[in-house]
Amino acid sequence: MSTICPPPSPAVAKTEIALSGESPLLAATFAYWDNILGPRVRHIWAPKTDQVLLSDGEITFLANHTLNGEILRNAESGAIDVKFFVLSEKGVIIVSLIFDGNWNGDRSTYGLSIILPQTELSFYLPLHRVCVDRLTHIIRKGRIWMHKERQENVQKIVLEGTERMEDQGQSIIPMLTGEVIPVMELLASMRSHSVPEDLDIADTVLNDDDIGDSCHEGFLLNAISSHLQTCGCSVVVGSSAEKVNKIVRTLCLFLTPAERKCSRLCEAESSFKYESGLFVQGLLKDATGSFVLPFRQVMYAPYPTTHIDVDVNTVKQMPPCHEHIYNQRRYMRSELTAFWRATSEEDMAQDTIIYTDESFTPDLNIFQDVLHRDTLVKAFLDQVFHLKPGLSLRSTFLAQFLLILHRKALTLIKYIEDDTQKGKKPFKSLRNLKIDLDLTAEGDLNIIMALAEKIKPGLHSFIFGRPFYTSVQERDVLMTF
C-alpha cells in the first residue's frame, strides 16, 4: 500500500472488530460534510489484525475522498446514491452510499463506506448487491435515529435552559456499530467458505451411481425443483457438515459462476449465522438438533428461499416472488414505523422491537410444503442417472439442461413483451401462455418464471401482481366486518 499524507484533522474515533478468520475488508467509515471544514470522518471500523494495512490517517483521507464533489448534490429527499471508486494509485476500492440527513440541527450530506484492497475486486463484485442492500437498510434506520436524537436533544436543551447546542448524533455510532459488524463478519465468512466458481460434479449428488445412493429420490427432486422455483435461493441445514455441503454443492450446479461466488459452504467446527442475500448457504444445527431461522433476515432476502433439512429430508419454500416482495415491503415499512415510535434506545434495539402495526401482522409461518410438481427436473434426473458416472457426460448433460431452461425463460419474456406491447397493455391470458410454451405443469411454470425474474426483474409482479393485490385487499376488507 502506497504512503499517503493525510490532511490535518482531529483524531477520529475508531472501533476495532475481532473477526474469526481473514477479513478482506480494510475498514468501514462514516463521514459527513462540514460546511466550514469540508468532508470529515466521524468514525472508523476496522478488523483487528496484527498487520496494519492502512493507518487511520490513510483511511481518513480515503473516506474524505468519497464526499468530494458532493457539495452541489441535488438529490431527491430520501435518495441514497451508490458510488463505486477504484483508486488504482492507492490500491483500494471504495463502495460508498451517499445520503442526506439531519445532524446538529442542520441538514447535511453523509457517506457510509467500506474500503477493500483492489486485489479483492473479483471477490467483492458478486457480493456487491448483498452489501449495498445491507448498507441501504442501515442508512434507513440511521436517518430515523439521527432525527430522533436531534428532537430529544433539542427538548433536553430547552428544558435545561441552555443556549449551547450539545453534540448530537453521537449515539448513532453504537447503532451503526451493531449493524456494520455483521457486514464485516459476512465478508470474512465468504472469504473462507464461499463456493468455488468452478464446481466439480464429482463432489455432488449427481455423481452417484444411482439416484438413491446419497439421498431419497423424492427428496432430491423436491430440493432441486424448489431451489429453481425460488430463483436459486436455498438454505440447507443439518447436523453433518459433510452432508450439508454435498447438497449445497449440488444446488450450486444450477447457478451461474457469479451466483456460486455469492453462496457459502457450511463450517464444520461451528455454524455460521443465516445471511440474507446469499444464493445458497449451509448451516449446522445446534447441539439439540434444532436451527431457528431469523424471521427478519429471511424477509429481507431479495428472493424467496427454499428451506432444506438433510436430516429429515424435508423441503419447504416461501411464497413466489410477487408475494414475497409485497410482504417484504410491508414488513420493512412496519419495522421502520416501530423504530420511529420507539421511545428509548432499548426499545430501538432490533431484537426487542415487535414488528407489527395496525395494518400489518407478519405471518411467522412463511415456509410451506412444495405444492407444485414439475416435469422438467423429474425428466432431467431420470435421464442424468442413466449416464455413466465419473466422466464428463453428466456435466455436459447438465449444461444442456440449464441452457434449455434459459432459452425457455427468454422465450417466455419475449412472449409477454409481444402480448403486452412491452408493458403498454395488461397481460391477457396466462392459460394461453402455459399452452403455447408447454408449461401446463404448475411447477414448470414456476421454474421458468423464477429464471425469467432474474433476467428481467419485476416480471412476477407484472403478471401476478394485480390479481394478488386485489385478493389481499378483498381479504382485508372482509376482515373488517
From Swiss-Prot:
Record's protein name: Guanine nucleotide exchange factor C9orf72 homolog
Location relative to the cell: Nucleus; Cytoplasm; Cytoplasm, P-body; Cytoplasm, Stress granule
Transmembrane segments: none
Keywords for this protein: Autophagy, Cell projection, Cytoplasm, Cytoplasmic vesicle, Endosome, Guanine-nucleotide releasing factor, Lysosome, Nucleus, Secreted
uDENN C9ORF72-type domain boundaries: 23-194
A GO MF label: small GTPase binding
GO cellular component: Atg1/ULK1 kinase complex; autophagosome; axonal growth cone; cytoplasm; cytoplasmic stress granule; cytosol; dendrite; endosome
Summary of subunit composition and partner proteins: Component of the C9orf72-SMCR8 complex, at least composed of C9orf72, SMCR8 and WDR41. The complex is formed of two protomers, each individually consisting of one molecule each of C9orf72, SMCR8 and WDR41. The protomers homodimerize via an interaction between C9orf72 (via C-terminus) and SMCR8 (via N-terminus). Within each protomer SMCR8 (via DENN domain) acts as a bridging protein between WDR41 (via C-terminus and N-terminus) and C9orf72 (via C-terminus). The C9orf72-SMCR8 complex associates with the ULK1/ATG1 kinase complex.
Domain dDENN C9ORF72-type: 370-464
Protein role: Acts as a guanine-nucleotide releasing factor (GEF) for Rab GTPases by promoting the conversion of inactive RAB-GDP to the active form RAB-GTP. Acts as a GEF for RAB39A which enables HOPS-mediated autophagosome-lysosome membrane tethering and fusion in mammalian autophagy. Component of the C9orf72-SMCR8 complex where both subunits display GEF activity and that regulates autophagy. As part of the C9orf72-SMCR8-WDR41 (CSW) complex, functions as GEF for RAB8A and RAB39B, thereby promoting autophagosome maturation.
GO biological process, one term: endocytosis
Positions of the cDENN C9ORF72-type domain: 200-343
Location of region: Required for the homodimerization of the C9orf72-SMCR8 complex: 461-481
InterPro entries for the chain: C9orf72
